[in-house]
Amino acid sequence: MSFNQSRSDKNEGYTQYRKSGRSNNFNPQRGSSGTHSKPGGAGGSAPTSSIASNRSFKKTNNAQGGQSRGGLPAVNSTDSSNAPNPRGVQNGAVAKPPEGPHSQRSTRDVPKAPTSQSAPLSSDGPAPTTPAKGTGDQPKEFAFQFGSISPGFMNGMQLPVRTSSAPPNLDEQKRDQARHESFRPVPPMPIPLAPKPQTQRKDTGAGDQPNVGQQLQQKDTGIINQPNTGDAHTVQKAKKDMQASPNHPTNQTQKPTTPMSGISMTMPYHPPQVPVPFGGPNQQMQSQGLTPTSLHMSIPVPLQIGSSPQVQQPMFVPGLHPHPMQPQGIIHQGQGLGFATQIGSQLPPQLSNLGMNVTSQYPQQQGGKFGGPRKSAVRITDPKTHEELIFDNKQSNAYADTGTSGPRPPYNLPSQTQPLPYAPSHAMNYYPNSYNPNPLYFASPSSLPLPSGQSAPNSQPHRFNYPVSQGSQNVPYIDMHVKKPSGGPMHGISDPPNREHTRDTHTFQPPAPSGTVHVTIKMPTDPTGGKGSDTLPNKLPTTEEGKSQKPSSPSVDLIPPSQRAVDTTSESSLHDSKLGREPSGIKSSPVISKQFTDGPPMVSLESQDSSSVQSSLTASSEESELAVAHSEVRRENLLGSDLHKDHQKKTSKKGYAQSLQHQISGQASSALGVPCQVQDTTSPLVSEAVEAKSLIIPAVVGGKSVSVSAVTSDPLESKDAGLVSVAHSSSPENPGLGNVKNLDLISDDNQDTSSKEKNSEPVVLKIEEQGQATFSEPPVDLKNSENVLDHDVSKSVEVAEKTERNLIVSSATVSNEVLTSETAQRAVDEPVSCNAEADVSASVSSSSTVPENSQDDKLVVDSSGRYDNMSSNEVLKNVVKSDQPSEPALNPGLSEGKNDGEVLDTVGTCANSSQGVSGTKDKSVVETSRVKGTTGKAKKRLKAILQMADAAGTTSDLYNAYKRPEEKKETVAHSESIERTESRSSSVDTEQESNEAIKEDAGALSKAEPDDWEDAADIATPDLESANGDGVGTSMLDSGDRTGDMAKKYSRDFLLKFAEQFLDLPHNFEVTSDIESLMSTHTNVSHHHDRDPYPSPGRVDRPSSGGSRLDRRGSNLVDDDRWSKLPGPFAPGQDPRLDLAYGATAGFRPGQGPNFGVLRNPRAQAPVQYAGGILAGPMQSMGPQGGLQRNNSDADRWQRATNFQKGLIPSPLTPLQTMHKAKKKYEVGKVSDEEETKQRQLKAILNKLTPQNFEKLFEQVKAVNIDNGRTLTGVISQIFDKALMEPTFCEMYANFCFHLAGELPDLSEDNEKITFKRLLLNKCQEEFERGEREQEEANKVEEEGEVKQSEEEREEKRIKARRRMLGNIRLIGELYKKKMLTERIMHECIKKLLGEYQNPDEEDVEALCKLMSTIGEMIDHPRAKDYMDSYFEIMTMLSNNMKLSSRVRFMLKDAIDLRKNKWQQRRKVEGPKKIEEVHRDAAQERQAQTGRFGRGPSINSSARRGGPPMDYGPRGSVVSSPGNQMGGFRAFLHQPRGYGGNQDARQDERQSYEARTLSVTSQRAGGDESITLGPQGGLARGMSIRGPQPSSAAPADMSPLPGDLRSAPIASLNGYSSASERATLTSKEDLISRHMPERFAGPTSMDHISSPERYSNYGNKDLRHSGRSFDRSRPISPATPPGPALTPSLPSEKVLSEDRLQQLSLTAIKEFYSARDEKEVALCIKELNSPAFHPTMISLWVTDVFERTNLERDLLAKLVVNLSRPNNGTLNQAHLVKGFEAVLGNLEDSVNDAPRAPEYLGQILGKVITESMVSLREVADLICQGGEVPGNLLQSGLGADVLGNILKTIKTEKGEGFLTDLRTNSNLRLETFLPPDPVKSRVLEEFI
């Protein structure tokens, strides 16, 4: 019985047989009572029941809610060996003794038929007695899983053979089923000895098992061959070691029908079951073994993913435990899987406990109903009669799983979470009422879903969350009345819902030994390829996938009455239902259910264009019909859950006829979607086929009868190859259908690799079109080929299996040509992917039709539903042919033999079948991937598709960006339906019909309240795809109108599916600009999936967001990359489920939470961040809370934005529009004229010129070839332009000219010598005169006829002229200082400016003052004294001229005073500064302000009064007083917390001020003693003065620093800790690094903060006085006990060591560079009180300055001179001589560090000599004796360089005359200083 059944139905069996342990394990194996030893299920038992967790693959139903838990052990499964050992089997395949198949309780397996067992069901051969539990001798049983049924025996009951004409009584069946429910530990009825085929499969334990059941069996088998991902739970023997995505097992857990996600399972995901090493070979186990404990549990919530809003999911309050898990009661978030397996399904509503604000999309599920009643019934209209066939909701409930209009799981990122291991195979229904009386729970207010996990808010990502059929939460069509699990197919489960639903159809059990199973499948002709109609006797409201998924295209399953008639065996009430229109060219996908019995089974596959698909498996002797009913309703599920289901199905072995039935139309995305897989009982490992059995499957495809023959090896043997030949003759009823000439399926054993492609070989489906069908036109009679059995294998592509064979369905286009896709699965990277289990996606056939004319086109659908082998041209043909609607008919109903490699996925293709691919479009592909445990090609492909979609499609605008990628389209045009872009309609379907269909579909959809405006819009316009308004996925109805209008529109997602298949463009393809832009945009994302098979967690491959994703996540295979993207606590390769201890619920990915795509379900707000799925309390956001992440093509892009600010949604990247390209495009810097190129280069250099990069840029100028007068003139003009407009930088530009003049050679043009100086002089004169002209023009009155200027314009001109003139004057003065201009020129300029002093011009006077201040000192020499006197007399007179403005008069007085003051500026004229100087000045200014703030009367008062000197050490320093310590440390401690750069600058400032304020206010010294906040001074020193100072102050302050301060960025206590400051304040400027240790207390304590990198901020403060003040305090504080801790406390008498003196002296000079306070330096030197150290100090200073800037060298020279002046007395000549002697002695070493040391030393000595501090003769003698060895300097040439630079400096400073006099007086012979050859000294040679 399906777990979804209402409890009332199940109560009998359930209560009776329910295992107590099951409650704890969501999916404890029901079948094996032993399995769940304890209620908690957490114990090892859980592992035992890895399958037993009732997530057994059968549990496929779990998600669906219908699967028998018992399925866990393969009964008597040889593989499972019936090992009761809990973990004996991978994932504890089934430790418990296999119970009868019934015990396993294939939820859906049990037909609804009366309990009476109808022997007829069994095929000839022994009655399908299911072996007793685990009787090894008996034929292997199949563990029942969704859709897995012992063919003749259901849960111990044999179903009477039903004629197709008489629909089964579903209610009756349900009741019976309930009685026999597999819940019972013991089969309700004696189990027939004959193994049910399923049972056998179980035994087979291998690929043969039904989808889920098979996997369960595998578990039983203990073989690691569990379904790849466990989605399919296909037991792949070959893959035993394979790690199927562990997630899938969880999927199988699917028991939680729906919202298991939210449930925090009692964590006991039995670790054993989950071999954590998901990456381990047995990852599959994980999925299976996880049973209850699967971390999947953290299924975010049953969020509806698809557009199917129809079924509202219950809201869950994250914090609420909706209902206690079965026995366990409510599971607390941290708890182990508390829910009984069964509960899992129920949990759906609260599954996740993840509170989701999501309005429950599914109304509360009534007993047994998971996913809630379906809102809408699927209406199938007969194309001809237009009569509606509505399936009863109850029935739909039974299959509710199949039809999920709810959001597709694929979008639920949670899919990764999806696998709720605990979901019982039974629908969670049991508890829904009791525990979830009201599905509505209010989610936590947090509206932001964890961004990293993208889970549809309403869908539970876990595949198992929903009843099997339910699939992901696509529960849109769940009929509450139905007792059976409803809800979208679990993602992890492949069509399990359908399988479960198969109970509706009678599953006959062919004799295990052998027999021909005749399966008659009537394919619903669902135009959209949705599950057109289930064969349910009652009318199922099957919502076309398109509808449920996307209202965009109403999908209607049309079954021509004739076909329906043909479908005599069909149980479905479809016959009863009236089909309004005849689907012309409807493709019905035959579903082949291949079950291997001992004998070759014969499967007759009839696909008729009927809404119902029936499959009957008959023993060779007897033919039973198994009506495959699947709710078409689930179309949406197909899309969303399709993927899940597909995966599940595939994984579960689509072999389940049930699943076939259910998903044939919907989930399989095609009739095949419900493929029955024949699983060979034998291990797939057997390479050879001992016996080949022929399987003949007659199928009617699109009204044509097709017989498929498959040669299968003996069940006991691995099926080496299955050859299926399909001969198909078109029936007159479906003239439009092409004939399937032959379908050749060859699957070889994995070992037989000779002809196999490693990844997979496509099964070739050859369709021969006997006649042309004109779909858009009235159907043309096609040649009818009577059932021709064609064994021709047009192409046998061997499917290479990694462990499983991927069955690739190649869909032949109508042409005879067989479409082969060698590469169809090349994209399948995952081993499991090979197991593409006839993914629904693969089953794309549903809505795709082969273009009529695309005879040559090849379409291959791999299990992933991909078109691999099609050439790009082919794709273009199929996709783009606008002239003819093309719909490749692919029947994705592929069921792969699990591990056996037995692939009997028959893709029935009807050329005309317009069945919409259910979700195959996008989802199919993804689904398949999902199914593959590891990673699905499809998934990768999906990833690529999504990425490509990002590049090409919806991103064009925000609206599209927020939308899910064409979900609607998905329904409409599924991946496989690409060619079918416009489904053809052979019959003339009027637009009216199409509208009617739309209305019907819309009506069904409308029944479910649209979740948002998008849905509403979709419903309003269901067909968005076709140009003319017809939905692409619409049934052929739509295409009827379109015959004339061939313009086709393809959804982006649809087209993108070909992205990876077709990488090469056609030869003649023209890449237009718009295409090129898209291509370029796509490059960044196209191959992401290659390295990240599992798309980023936030971006689940849309189609399969179900359990498979969960499995993947659970597995270690998960890419580290993907996990690393998650900010959450989960380690990159770690399964979050393992982290439950951390409070994360199992299966809950860090960011996972409902993710509502932007407006997808605006009402569904993800509650708080789900911690681990259950509301563990708002955890720290594991991921950016920013943009809601969606599971759509944009998801990955959004997912990557993990660092967005909260609340910000990054705008998706949209493809850039191609820029208009001019014929002759402009290229930057490209100039034809060489001269212009040079000028541009020079201008660029000048624009970047600054004092800092002067030297570097000057080298670039030299690199420019200035080789003619024109270029040279241009350079000078540019320099003048820059200088005149930037007067502040005149000095720099003059220096530039000076260097340039020295570097440029003399040029000659026309025999005329051209020199730079000459051109420069001309330019100066020109500019000077030009300035006068401009002034005159600005002042003159306009003459008549001239344009009159306004006063503003005139003033503007005047200002501009004045600025230029002043700049010119200043530049001239600077050039003169550089000796570029002569003194005579200067005098001429002055005279010109004085001009008419009687009537002075203010601008001229101002310029004169500026010039005098610039060059006055140089021209005021004795020889020019007369001139200067006359100038200043005039200036004095002008200064008293009241006609001048006061500003100008004061300027004149300043110039006069300047001359009187010997040209010494009262204040330094500020010129350009380097950045570090700017920082220093800013620091000083700030320090001065804080000093005023914290100190007493005045800054220097204490020092002058003898009080403790101020300390300018870093304010708030760590060594401040104890009171200050806390405040000071606050800043330090804050920063590490902010991780450095994150800290707000204002915070730093605030903290620093807090520290300062605290220290100042808390302990303010009394009196007028100033208190410095520095480390040594201020409070600390004040304390020492007033009383004893704790000697440990400094160490104590330092010790508490957290960690090593050098590494942690610390907020500057003075608030000045910008990065630039830290960068610029290098060790050179950071005096603290060297002197602070002494000041503080010991080098050791200070070491923590001394280094500049650590405390660059120390440089911020003005440390000018620190060294001095520290030391000066010594004499003041003799009372302080001497100690090493504090320098200030040292007694004054103590003589400092040499090292100490060096450190202090360096500290003092560094302070001087910053503060430029010579007095402070003098005080520091006096405090050293060591005159003998002065020469060494000078030596240290000079050597140190070699590595400093020119400015600092100038400062040092002036300092030395001033300190040596007699009036100062700090230094004397002897000190200087000895000091320079030491420098010269070490010059050879200094050159290594500072190559230009000789130049710098010469500059310093030149200035000292100029000031007469030392004579040139003395210096020359020092040079001669200099070097480590006396005389070495001369030998090396360094001495000559030093002397040459001395002379050069003297000449620059004092002029050539002064130098000549000096040389004469010194009596030097410069030749003696020249180095021996070959060494040269150019500098000195200039003076010789």
From Swiss-Prot:
One protein family per Pfam = MA3
Q: How does it assemble?
A: EIF4F is a multi-subunit complex, the composition of which varies with external and internal environmental conditions. It is composed of at least EIF4A, EIF4E and EIF4G. Interacts directly with eIF4E. In higher plants two isoforms of EIF4F have been identified, named isoform EIF4F and isoform EIF(iso)4F. Isoform EIF4F has subunits p220 and p26, whereas isoform EIF(iso)4F has subunits p82 and p28.
**Record PANTHER family:** EUKARYOTIC TRANSLATION INITIATION FACTOR 4 GAMMA, EUKARYOTIC TRANSLATION INITIATION FACTOR 4 GAMMA 2
The task this protein performs is described as: Component of the protein complex eIF4F, which is involved in the recognition of the mRNA cap, ATP-dependent unwinding of 5'-terminal secondary structure and recruitment of mRNA to the ribosome.
Q: What is the effect of changing L1055A?
A: Impaired eIF4E binding
Disulphide-bonded residues: none
The Gene Ontology CC terms held by the record are: eukaryotic translation initiation factor 4F complex
Q: What is this protein called?
A: Eukaryotic translation initiation factor 4G
**Source taxonomy lineage?**
Eukaryota, Viridiplantae, Streptophyta, Embryophyta, Tracheophyta
Q: Is the RNA-binding keyword given for this protein? A: yes
Family matches, as SMART domains: MA3 (SM00544), MIF4G (SM00543)
Highest taxon, organism lineage: Eukaryota
Organism, scientific name: Cucumis melo
Q: What PROSITE patterns does the record point to? A: MI
Region annotation (EIF4E-binding) maps to: 1048-1093
User: Compositional bias (Low complexity) at which positions?
Assistant: 603-630, 840-850
MIF4G domain residues: 1239-1462
Please give a single GO biological process term from the UniProt record. regulation of translation
Q: What is the effect of changing L1078D?
A: Impaired eIF4E binding
